[in-house]
């Protein structure tokens, strides 16, 4: 099945501590999760790695969110939207369900 949320899509978080925040998808994991820029930040305790000249400390990084907890953001309507698929000129493309506009 084709992915409804893809890398570089702008999405909005539907549930959780970051509800309502928007961000760009950095990575889509095969486990049904996505990593979004600046969303779901967690503190990771990093050990120093002298061989790579990396210092230790507490680092903030993005954690994965379930893909069901985010929705693609439709800039035309300014709201979260659902994604559908259709064929145009022999190619399968994604479109917004609210206004039938093709997603780039």
Curated annotation (Swiss-Prot):
Family annotation (InterPro entries): KOW, Rib_uL2_dom2, Ribosomal_uL24, Ribosomal_uL24_CS, Ribosomal_uL24_KOW, Translation_prot_SH3-like_sf
Keywords: Ribonucleoprotein, Ribosomal protein, RNA-binding, rRNA-binding
Single GO BP term: translation
GO cellular component, one term: ribonucleoprotein complex
Highest rank taxon of the organism: Bacteria
PANTHER family documented for this protein: MITOCHONDRIAL RIBOSOMAL PROTEIN L24 (PTHR12903)
Protein family according to the UniProt entry: Belongs to the universal ribosomal protein uL24 family.
Subunit text: Part of the 50S ribosomal subunit.
NCBIfam families: rplX_bact
Name the record gives this protein: Large ribosomal subunit protein uL24
């Amino acid at each position: 099945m084709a992915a409804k949320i893809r890398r570089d899509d702008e999405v909005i978080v539907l549930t959780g501590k970051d509800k309502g925040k928007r961000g760009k998808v950095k990575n889509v994991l095969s486990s049904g999760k996505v990593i979004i820029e600046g969303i779901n930040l967690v503190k990771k305790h990093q050990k120093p790695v002298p061989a790579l000249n990396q210092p230790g400390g507490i680092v903030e990084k993005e954690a994965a969110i379930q893909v069901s907890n985010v929705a693609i953001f439709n800039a035309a309507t300014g709201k979260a939207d659902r994604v559908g698929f259709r064929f145009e000129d022999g190619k399968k493309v994604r479109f917004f369900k609210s206004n039938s506009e093709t997603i780039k």
